[in-house]
Amino acid sequence: MSEYIAPLKDIRFAMQDLAALDQIVSLPGCQEATPDVVDAILEEAAKFAGEVLSPLNQVGDKEGVKWKDTAVTTSSGFKQAYRQFVDNGWNALGCDPEFGGQGLPRLLSTAVSEMWKASNHAFSLCPMLTQGAIEALMIAGSDEQKAVYLPNLVSGEWAGTMNLTEPSAGSDLAAVRSRAEPVGDGTYRIFGQKIFITYGEHDMTDNIVHLVLARTPDAPEGVKGISLFVVPKFMLKADGKPGERNDVFCVSLEHKLGIHASPTAVLAFGDHGGAIGTL
């Protein structure tokens, strides 16, 4: 088994001499990223990547993930490593403090995420997809969606996914056929199937927030007719905690070379009446 040793000298050079870290930390909101803080974070990230994530890389690729009755079990050690990842605050590193993030420069969080990817790419795909969901909600989410979902996504207690590809629509999003039917109360029922969904189903978080591309009934053809919906794996109770299971299930798994420990799911939306989502 190969050992991962983070190239901290190269990372520091890239951050300081190429990306002008000194200038970035002088910007409003970035002043807490002092040289001592940055160095400490890089050192701890290198330690976590080398001692926790790297040893699981080969284990995960040999074991893979297991699917049974729509549920997915991740490889040995992944769930525990993710719990440690969340408890240590790594997921919140570069996120907005308004929603529980640490507000550190994106340059730093990018350097840290590079260590996750280099030491265990299959593991790193989960927080990477969650980060994408966070960014999408920050830009396009409603105030209610931000308040409900962002704190748990930022902390890493919940994970996020991106649902674009369909059996008849790969990179051609104009061909997306998943549909969203309005219920009348501000929600929609989502119907369709999505494939190649990274971490579309797993056991590492209490909930999964799916961002799903679908068409409303009167939507025009092509990409202009596509809308993005928030579809949680579990509907939320009045206290904001996961409750009843939503109508989205993993019906099988794909297998990708080199990342067998990353569950690549085929997700069915609406086979039992419609998956509830919000625009």
Residue spans for each PLM region:
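Amphipathic, small/basic residue-rich leader segments at the start of a protein or domain
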Residues: 1-124, 148
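Long, well-ordered alpha-helical segments
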Residues: 11, 15-22, 48-56, 144, ...
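Structured core elements
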Residues: 84, 92-94, 161-163, 177-182, ...
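Core alpha/beta catalytic barrel or barrel-like domain that forms the active/cofactor pocket
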Residues: 92, 96-97, 119-134, 156-166, ...
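Internal maturation/activation junctions in enzymes
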Residues: 129-130, 141-182
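Short Gly/Pro-enriched turn/cap motifs at secondary-structure boundaries
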Residues: 168-171, 201-203, 220, 256-262
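A short core secondary-structure module
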Residues: 187, 191-241
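A glycine-rich, basic-preceded beta-loop-alpha segment at the flavin cofactor/substrate interface
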Residues: 196-198, 235-251, 256, 263-279
